[in-house]
């Protein structure tokens, strides 16, 4: 940099390749730290929380299964009840008709036989009485006629005697008394049992009619069953009463464990950030410190150039020095300590040294990144998640869910019993009232036939023993049905469900923790793989330089061998003409011969000509 002064040169020292390399290393470490921290912090977001929805999905499946089973149960029960209702109706009517028909036939036979006997006997009695009365009245009439003539004579004589003593000739005629007596006998003559009595007796011959009892009974029995079947037909799409099956809420395992997971993630990322900051600070300090020797070197160069240029200007002589070798290779200050050999020049040339420096820089970056990753590995060991809060929530959630299931089954049980058997219970009550009314009608019919007869008591007893007692039993059975007809839905096994849910939660707990741990391990493994790849690449670059070293050794050995051969051939011809070893030039001589330096900027020579005029050249 011959055109720049010392201050201008110092202003660009920070742009040296060493500082640039350290800055690149710092950037690489920073990017590595950022990506690693981001990966660690994102692990909780990628945790498998799908297990949280598992209980809800299971409860939905249970709900669908329970509702489908309940609907199938209700439909099957409705169909069964339709068949049962028709069967019971026909059986009841068959029993009633059998009992009523049997005893109607018996009643008819008893009534017909009794009425025929009574009618025939009564008719004979009436006819006999009428004949006897007529004969008796004729006999009495004959006697009365004779008595009437005697009495008339007595009356006539008495009347005449009375007239004699009284002298009254206007006395009543005796025929008046005779007429009166004859009239009385005439009424007795017409005396007989009326024929209407025979008509009433003949009415008993007519068969007793129980058809009204049958028709009314059949109508009464069919009415509740018809109403019941109509109601069932309306409930073909029997709903479940609008009661919803309880669903388990999401477990929120990740929400509960998120605090622990976030704390672990924060701790790991903090450790990584701290380690990266330390490394970055060290690299920044190194980047600053590496400029110190460079500044010093620039200062030495500047002083030397000032002295040389001043001496040259003072002599007013232009010397041309070759500075290419001194300034083209910036590693010259370090290489000067190495033996001045061809091999060192070859392997540390600009082409070869680039691969070596980049490879070593890569290894250094890998080493720094591995330090950060190693800190993460150490911190990641023994990462556990506190599941006590999860267990507590599980216990509370399970208790609430089981109570909700109990409430659901109880409501469904009441709903099904009401919709399926509510009408059955009302029908049983109606049948009870129907049977009661039937017995009342039957008793009224029997009483209308046998009332005020000697058969009333026995017939009522027979009716009760044969029909009434059975109807009482039927009424008792219907009452029992009304009190006990219900469906008891079997409840779920609470203990088994609770154990299963706890098993799911424990698996989800371990899943949450294991997923986080696996995420950390996968992240570490991924970055290890990346670091290994960077290590391989860096080693490959160093290997290229090593290969160049081997090539240089081969070339150096070859050249040395050729040189020895040439020297051997020259030795025989120059045995007598030996030249002594050259003497090293002094510094003044080196300046005169232009050894190692060249002045390429006349402007600088003129600039310092007046300043350095008259000065001597100092030894450097």
From Swiss-Prot:
Residue ranges, Extracellular side: 1-19, 108-274, 374-534
GO CC annotation: mating projection tip; plasma membrane
Keywords tagged on the record: Cell membrane, Conjugation, Glycoprotein, Membrane, Transmembrane, Transmembrane helix
Function, as annotated: Involved in cell fusion during mating by stabilizing the plasma membrane fusion event.
Top-level taxon in the UniProt lineage: Eukaryota
PANTHER family associated with the record: PLASMA MEMBRANE FUSION PROTEIN PRM1
Source organism of the structure: Scheffersomyces stipitis (strain ATCC 58785 / CBS 6054 / NBRC 10063 / NRRL Y-11545)
Keyword Cell membrane: yes
InterPro entries, alphabetized: PRM1
Family under the similarity heading: Belongs to the PRM1 family.
Membrane topology: Multi-pass membrane protein
Residues glycosylated per entry: 130, 169, 190, 215, 235, 267, 396, 432, 443, 484
Sequence intervals crossing the membrane: 20-40, 87-107, 275-295, 353-373, 535-555
Protein name as it appears in the record: Plasma membrane fusion protein PRM1
């Amino acid at each position: 940099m011959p055109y720049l002064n010392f201050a201008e040169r110092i202003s660009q020292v920070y742009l040296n390749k060493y500082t640039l390399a350290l800055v690149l290393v710092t950037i690489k470490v920073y990017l590595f730290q950022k990506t690693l921290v981001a990966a660690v912090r994102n692990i909780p977001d990628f945790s498998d929380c799908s297990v949280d929805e598992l209980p809800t999905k299971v409860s939905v499946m249970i709900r669908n299964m329970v509702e489908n089973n309940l609907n199938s149960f209700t439909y099957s029960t409705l169909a069964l009840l339709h068949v049962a209702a028709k069967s019971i109706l026909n059986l009841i009517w068959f029993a009633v008709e059998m009992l009523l028909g049997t005893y109607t036939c018996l009643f008819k036979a008893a009534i017909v036989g009794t009425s025929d006997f009574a009618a025939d006997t009564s008719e004979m009695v009436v006819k006999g009485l009428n004949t006897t009365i007529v004969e008796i009245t004729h006999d009495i009439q004959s006697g009365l006629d004779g008595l009437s003539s005697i009495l008339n004579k007595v009356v006539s004589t008495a009347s005449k005697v009375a007239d004699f003593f009284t002298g009254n000739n206007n006395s009543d005629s005796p025929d008046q008394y005779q007429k009166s007596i004859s009239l009385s006998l005439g009424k007795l003559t017409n005396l007989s049992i009326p024929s209407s009595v025979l008509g009433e007796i003949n009415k008993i011959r007519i068969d007793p009619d129980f058809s009204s009892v049958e028709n009314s009974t059949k109508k009464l029995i069919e009415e509740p069953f018809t109403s019941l079947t109509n109601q069932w037909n309306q409930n073909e799409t029997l709903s479940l009463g609008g009661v919803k099956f309880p669903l388990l809420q999401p477990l929120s395992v990740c929400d509960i464990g998120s605090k622990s997971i976030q704390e672990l993630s924060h701790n790991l990322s903090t450790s990584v950030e701290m380690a990266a900051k330390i490394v970055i600070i060290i690299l920044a300090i190194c980047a600053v410190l590496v400029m110190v020797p460079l500044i010093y070197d620039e200062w030495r160069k500047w002083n030397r150039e000032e002295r040389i240029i001043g001496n040259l200007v003072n002599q007013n002589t232009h010397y041309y020095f070759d500075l290419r070798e001194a300034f083209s290779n910036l590693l010259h200050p370090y290489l000067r300590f190495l033996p001045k050999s061809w091999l060192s020049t070859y392997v540390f040339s600009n082409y070869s040294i680039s691969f070596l420096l980049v490879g070593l820089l890569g290894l250094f970056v890998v080493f720094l990144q591995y330090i950060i990753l190693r800190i993460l590995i150490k911190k990641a060991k023994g990462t556990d998640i506190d599941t006590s809060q999860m267990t507590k929530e599980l216990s509370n959630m399970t208790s609430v869910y089981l109570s909700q299931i109990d409430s659901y089954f109880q409501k469904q049980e009441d709903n099904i019993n009401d919709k399926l058997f509510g009408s059955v219970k009302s029908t049983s009550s109606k049948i009870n009232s129907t049977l009661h009314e039937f017995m009342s009608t039957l008793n009224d019919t029997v009483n209308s036939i046998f009332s005020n007869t000697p058969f009333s008591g026995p017939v009522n007893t027979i009716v009760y023993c044969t029909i009434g007692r059975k109807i009482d039993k039927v009424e008792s059975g219907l009452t029992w049905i009304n009190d006990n007809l219900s469906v008891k839905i079997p409840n779920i096994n609470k203990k088994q469900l609770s154990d299963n849910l706890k098993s799911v939660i424990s698996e989800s707990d371990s899943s949450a923790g294991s997923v986080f741990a696996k995420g950390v391990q996968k992240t570490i493994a991924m970055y290890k793989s990346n670091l290994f790849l960077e290590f391989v690449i860096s080693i490959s670059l160093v290997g290229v330089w090593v290969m160049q070293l081997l090539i240089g050794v081969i070339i150096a050995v070859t050249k040395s061998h050729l040189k020895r051969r040439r020297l051997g051939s020259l030795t025989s011809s120059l045995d007598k003409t030996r030249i002594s070893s050259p003497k090293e030039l002094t510094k003044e001589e080196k300046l005169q011969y232009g050894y190692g330096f060249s002045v390429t900027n006349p402007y600088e020579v003129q600039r310092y000509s007046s300043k350095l005029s008259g000065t001597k050249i100092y030894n450097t």
